[in-house]
């Protein structure tokens, strides 16, 4: 496979977004993907890009400001849930989420600017 038109984002910032071993979106999934990709040689045939954080203005384009503030507060407290019981809060979830959102926005932006053909953000 030789496809430099595909960019894969990975970095430890994205790996911080996860909800523990018991949750389907555990923090170990990104590291497992990276190990498998390197093992298969995928990292040598695509462009690798670093994660990027978004700002609060980006977040409130989708979420109500009160919810963004609540997530930031829950991130400091480090417990409770961000929704009806499926998304646990943990210390640092706000900043981890900013990297997930910012990376997705950066990938879309680069594609729309015709710098890349495809991008892959392995987080969900």
Feature-to-residue mapping (PLM):
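HDAC/HDAC-like amidohydrolase catalytic core signature
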Residues: 1-124
């Amino acid at each position: 496979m030789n496809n430099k038109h595909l960019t894969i984002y990975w970095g430890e910032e994205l790996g911080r977004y996860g909800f523990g071993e018991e949750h389907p979106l555990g923090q170990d999934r990104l590291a497992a993907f990276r190990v498998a990709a390197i093992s298969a040689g995928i990292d040598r045939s695509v462009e690798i890009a670093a994660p990027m954080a978004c700002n609060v203005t980006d977040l409130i384009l989708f979420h109500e400001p009160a919810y963004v503030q609540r997530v930031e507060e829950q991130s400091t407290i480090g417990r409770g849930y961000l929704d009806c019981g499926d998304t646990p809060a943990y210390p640092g979830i706000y900043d981890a989420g900013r990297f997930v959102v910012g990376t997705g926005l950066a990938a879309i932006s680069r594609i729309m600017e015709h710098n890349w053909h495809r991008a892959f953000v392995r987080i969900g």
